């Protein structure tokens, strides 16, 4: 009996630890892993989301780079399109990833540099409908080398 109780607690602890560090599906707006860490210029990362009632998003982006990434910064455009295909919100971003000497601004972990970057705090979509969330990379050379994964998250 004692052994069964101990096993139950060990199993419960393992399941809790496995769940830590992973995003729940309802927090992920869009996600893409890049084959061979290459991202073509007009290969948009997007996802359609059905909005049923007024919703507020607190958006951030987790993006991972490899040593092959050639730039000190990352430029992108984040756009939300309404159900008619019209831009609802759009903004260009430029994030500094490395210092002037080319050293990363974050420690390397699991063979990549992973940044969590603020995108849009308190984005409110009032009208119901199908909306498309899109991220477009704006770096000058294509394909962009060294991007491993991108995740747009709702932190609410």
Predicted region positions:
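Bacterial N-terminal signal peptides that target proteins for export
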Residues: 1-9
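Start-of-domain marker
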Residues: 24-76, 89
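C-terminal motif of bacterial Sec signal peptides marking the signal peptidase cleavage site
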Residues: 18-19
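Solvent-exposed strand-loop boundary residues in beta-sheet-rich modules
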Residues: 82-86
């Amino acid at each position: 009996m004692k052994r069964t109780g101990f096993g139950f607690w060990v199993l419960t602890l393992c399941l809790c630890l496995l769940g830590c560090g992973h995003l729940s599906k309802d927090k992920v707006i869009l996600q893409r892993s890049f084959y061979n860490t290459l991202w073509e210029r007009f290969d948009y990362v997007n996802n359609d989301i059905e909005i049923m009632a007024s919703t507020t998003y607190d958006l951030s982006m987790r993006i991972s780079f490899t040593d092959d990434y050639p730039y000190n910064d990352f430029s992108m455009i984040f756009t939300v399109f309404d159900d008619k295909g019209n831009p609802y919100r759009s903004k260009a971003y430029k994030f500094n990833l490395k210092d002037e000497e080319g050293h990363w601004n974050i420690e390397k972990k699991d063979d990549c540099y992973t940044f969590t970057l603020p995108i849009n705090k308190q984005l409110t979509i009032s009208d119901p409908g199908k909306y498309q969330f899109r991220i477009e990379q704006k770096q000058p050379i294509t394909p962009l080398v060294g991007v491993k994964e991108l995740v747009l998250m709702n932190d609410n």
